Amino acid sequence: RTLLRAYKFNENTNKYKNLFYVTRIYYAFLALANTDTYGDMPFKEYVQAKIPETNNVAYNTQAEVYDAMFRMLEQAVDSIKPNDATQIGYATDDICYHGDWNKWLRFANSLRLRMALRISNVDPARAKEEAQNALNNQYGLMQSNEDNMQIVPKYAPVSQGGTDDGGNEHPLVMCSVCYNGESVMSKDLENFYRCLLYTSPSPRD
């Protein structure tokens, strides 16, 4: 929301168009995960960078959210110009695709196709239209693992694309990122909890 408001009130928005529409792709990506999990959700006010007047924010139906996401992705794909030298780049701050506009565009089209498949049993006509738009777009779809969208935090090891700033990581990050998720409970700790199970008094006691 802050970025959208900054973009709206900037006197020279033309050179930031690619950056702005990348955020729309990412916004749709996050919204898709949320609406697929929870269904109806607050969306309209937030996507327009409005500040709700109360905590009782209106919910949009899942159909409305999907419709908005389709339009967001279509607008992003139509607006991002990979070869426009006047656009401000951000390779060092892009923790997903390192400033590669074409990969963002392929990711957007792939999201459109995924969404079309999701609604194919609910709205076949809309699904067919959106799928064809994604498949026929000039930038294409994700082609290989090189196009995978991954979020690599800067504190991740250099081998994983981070900067490995050494020592500032949260312990959970160390377990999930730095140790590749290969962290297990020690045998001593396992036995400790097992002993508690047998020695703890029952609720009746």
Protein language model features and the residues they cover:
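Structured, solvent-exposed acidic/aromatic patches
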Residues: 1-200, 204
